């Protein structure tokens, strides 16, 4: 879609003029380049993509105010980004405090924007002006075009400074803003954008803003050969968060067809909740405040959870599924729940610049009241759905009680909760978890070699054996009772599920060391599924790693080398031949970790000075949840489609 198609005419409410008087200056821009992490979280790929979110958030602020219906995001050749909206256009008249055009103030002064006085925006997630100036400060160059008042105004910047003052470059009958920028390679570890990451975020924004159309396109030459559906998406969801829940549950089996939707408003604050139960055991709750994802929850989630538990307990007693002295816990009520909570409020109090948690206590009361009132009405009007939900909560309650008994049984066996460790654990001498590593090793043979080859001062070894439980298909009671997972739980010492306590964690590096074959990949996946579902903070805090053992052993005479890929094998082979193609090189493929002697295992896979570790990260919880459900869940067809689509990317697999 061409830019001028996005920049459609938009009527402006004369009673709520958006001009330079709405732009207030609070402080300067100097600190951004010195401490970028304070403003965008990090200078890794996460921070790189955050630049795009900041500009898009500003466009969505226009949508929230009722002035924008279309946004486009384009990844251009050279990994520059263009964001176009058909809002009112950033003000270009003179801002009174500075005597400069408001456009210049917005892009060069931190905390200069239309959010702070309450006139420009009643609801804002992007803090219009904060994100704009930060993106400018961290860009090698940035160009803004504003279509407003019949004219096209253009201004150019570099690393936070004006390089070309605002000029009029044409006329227009549209309104809106076009921003193009190039991330500064001096500031970022990586400057290549991921279409998939941006597409996922833009899809989320489209779900949260019913009727807003967001288009994303990848125009890089390297992407030209990809099919259209992999490099261009246009998204508009009239059903809003109801469609979001349907999307999240598409790989699961819903218990009821209808997505439950409740909404309400008090003053300038409003909340909407969409929810649907599935036959799984895991909760997926996504919460947002002014379109900003709050992964650590906050008051809106507290209000929802409190009301949900109260409503289901009261309803259960009313229909005699619960006795007067019986109750189901909040955890029981949320088993198999997929829920999206979206609140809009005038003065959102986020914890931290990255806005991970919402702190407004008044929104807890609003959400609680909406759910308490309207969910109760829904259950009364839909008794069949109500009974299905209660039945699932009761089943979860029984499983939780069974898990509690299993835990207590384990504690009794370990000297009333003492520190008795698994028999197979070969612990280290160091007690400080910040300095210790736990290698979870596939097989007793490799476990023996690892034990002999390790540095026992700080490296602990736990061998795994036999078939491991797929926790995607199991409740907590089965997990606690599983003889393959119990040693892992006990060795780590932090508990699982709602009882997980990272203060009790015994190791801050948990390294999965499995064979470089299909079986090894399966074991890694089973362990990661377990960590994701029952010990997610381990992944969120960056404690989980995958070891990278060598694939090949190359020998020439008394010289032995190893290679970690086919490419490295060929390079090492050529090096050992020394330009003589007739030199004999013995090349063997390691079939498993157990083939390596203790010295080889230490030298290649365990020595902190030489080894390669891959940290397991969680950038997108929704995508991770979906992937684990597809790969490890009950449904075969989604798994088949997933594998077929990605088969071309499979490497280093032995069949």
Question: Could you tell me what each predicted segment is?
Answer:
Residues 61-62, 89-90, 518-519:
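Residues immediately C-terminal
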Residues 35, 179, 465-476, 480-481:
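Gly-rich Lys/Arg/Thr-decorated short loops/hinges at beta-loop-alpha junctions or inter-strand turns
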Residues 1-19, 29, 53, 61-63, ...:
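GHKL-family ATPase ATP-binding module
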Residues 20-35:
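Mature N-terminal segment immediately following signal peptide/propeptide cleavage
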Residues 398-417, 432-437, 448, 452-454, ...:
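C-terminal interaction appendages of subunits in large macromolecular complexes
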Residues 34-53:
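Conserved short strand/loop->alpha-helix "switch" segment adjacent to the catalytic nucleotide/phosphoryl-transfer site
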Residues 90-113:
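Short conserved segment of the HATPase_c
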């Amino acid at each position: 879609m061409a830019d001028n198609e996005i920049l459609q005419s938009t009527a402006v409410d004369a009673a709520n003029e958006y001009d330079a008087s709405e732009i207030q200056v609070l402080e300067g821009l100097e600190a951004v380049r010195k401490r970028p992490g304070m403003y965008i979280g990090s200078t890794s790929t996460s921070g790189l993509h955050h630049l795009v979110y900041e500009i898009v958030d500003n466009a969505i602020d226009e949508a929230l105010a009722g002035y924008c219906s279309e946004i486009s995001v384009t990844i251009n050749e050279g990994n520059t980004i263009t964001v176009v909206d058909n809002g009112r256009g950033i003000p270009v008249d003179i801002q009174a405090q500075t005597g400069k055009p408001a456009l210049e103030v917005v892009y060069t002064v931190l905390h200069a924007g239309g959010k702070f006085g309450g006139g420009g925006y009643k609801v804002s997630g992007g803090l219009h002006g904060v994100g704009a100036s930060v993106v400018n400060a961290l860009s090698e160059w940035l160009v803004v075009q504003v279509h407003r008042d019949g004219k096209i105004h253009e201004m150019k910047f570099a690393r936070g400074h004006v390089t070309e003052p605002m000029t009029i470059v044409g006329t227009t009958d549209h309104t809106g803003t076009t921003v193009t920028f190039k991330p500064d390679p001096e500031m970022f570890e990586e400057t290549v954008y991921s279409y998939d990451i941006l597409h996922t975020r833009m899809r989320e924004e489209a779900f949260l803003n019913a009727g807003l159309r967001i288009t994303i396109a990848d125009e890089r030459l390297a992407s030209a050969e990809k099919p259209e559906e992999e490099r261009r998406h246009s998204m508009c969801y009239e059903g809003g968060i109801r469609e979001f829940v349907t999307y999240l549950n598409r790989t699961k089996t819903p218990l009821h067809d209808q997505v439950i939707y409740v909404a309400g408003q008090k003053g300038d604050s409003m909340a909407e909740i969409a929810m649907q139960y599935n036959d799984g055991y895991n909760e997926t709750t996504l919460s947002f405040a002014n379109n900003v994802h709050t992964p650590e929850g906050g008051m809106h989630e507290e209000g929802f959870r409190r009301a949900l538990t109260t409503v289901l307990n009261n309803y259960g007693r009313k229909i005699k599924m619960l006795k007067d002295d019986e109750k189901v816990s909040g955890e029981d009520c949320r088993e198999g729940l997929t829920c999206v909570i979206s609140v809009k409020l005038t003065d959102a109090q986020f914890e931290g610049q990255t806005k991970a948690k919402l702190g407004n206590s008044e929104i807890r009361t609003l959400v609680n009241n909406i759910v308490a009132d309207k969910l109760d009405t829904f259950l009364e009007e839909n008794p069949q759905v109500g009974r299905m939900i209660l039945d699932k909560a009761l089943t979860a309650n029984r499983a939780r009680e069974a898990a509690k008994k299993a835990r207590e049984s384990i504690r009794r066996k370990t000297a009333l909760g003492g520190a008795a460790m698994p028999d197979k654990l070969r612990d280290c001498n160091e007690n400080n978890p910040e300095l210790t590593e736990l290698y979870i090793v596939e097989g007793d043979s490799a476990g023996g070699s690892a034990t002999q080859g390790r540095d026992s001062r700080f490296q602990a070894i736990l061998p795994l054996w036999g078939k491991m439980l797929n926790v995607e298909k199991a409740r907590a009671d089965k997990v606690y009772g599983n003889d393959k997972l119990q040693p892992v739980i006990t060795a780590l010492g932090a508990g699982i599920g709602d009882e997980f306590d990272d203060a009790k964690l015994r190791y801050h590096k948990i390294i999965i060391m499995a064979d470089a074959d299909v079986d090894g990949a399966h074991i890694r996946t089973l362990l990661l599924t377990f960590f994701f579902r029952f010990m997610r903070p381990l992944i969120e805090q960056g404690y989980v790693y995958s070891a990278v053992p060598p694939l090949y052993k190359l020998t020439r005479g008394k010289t032995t080398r190893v290679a970690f890929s086919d490419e490295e094998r060929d390079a090492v082979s050529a090096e050992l031949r020394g330009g003589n193609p007739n030199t004999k090189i013995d090349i063997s493929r390691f079939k498993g970790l157990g083939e390596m002697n203790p010295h080889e295992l230490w030298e290649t896979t365990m020595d902190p000075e030489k080894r390669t570790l891959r940290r397991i990260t969680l950038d997108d919880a929704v995508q991770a949840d979906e992937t684990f459900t597809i790969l490890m869940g009950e449904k075969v067809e989604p798994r088949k489609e997933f594998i077929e689509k990605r088969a071309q990317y499979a490497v280093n697999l032995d069949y």
